[in-house]
């Protein structure tokens, strides 16, 4: 599973949420990003252990254009089997593309796919990942991309028992020491 460079909450949540879904289904799956994953998203990948296997499918999540993969993953761009995205600007570079431009986040598209195809029952960690992506890409549900479907997906994810208030505070209210220092100057 490939995510975009300069990772945000949606690409990290999509990548790890989908990875955990596939693993729960008995599939081998790993997440790759050209850039280091920000520590603020560590709660989504702290227990993640990469698996050793040769992939037969490559999925890109929240990657509208292969240029967004970054230099470390650019070599895989022409081999992407499936792209799951929500950007109307998607350039359809994958063999198959699932784009829902009315969705607030790729995580919303993935959750809809999980439900509609009855892939597996999400657990608390999967729900945490998917909710985080929806929350961050919707600006904590205040951006115009937020729809009734966005709220319904978030509500269904909340049923899995994670702490949404903590996630929203961490994503929108907490500042790193380095950011505080920059703002003080």
Describe the residue ranges of each PLM region:
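Glycine-rich, phosphate-binding/catalytic loops in enzymes
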Residues: 18-19, 75-78, 99-100, 152
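Active-site cofactor/cluster-binding pocket
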Residues: 42-96
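Hydrophobic helix-and-loop "lid/oligomerization" segment in the mid-to-C-terminal part
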Residues: 1-40, 49-56, 136-185
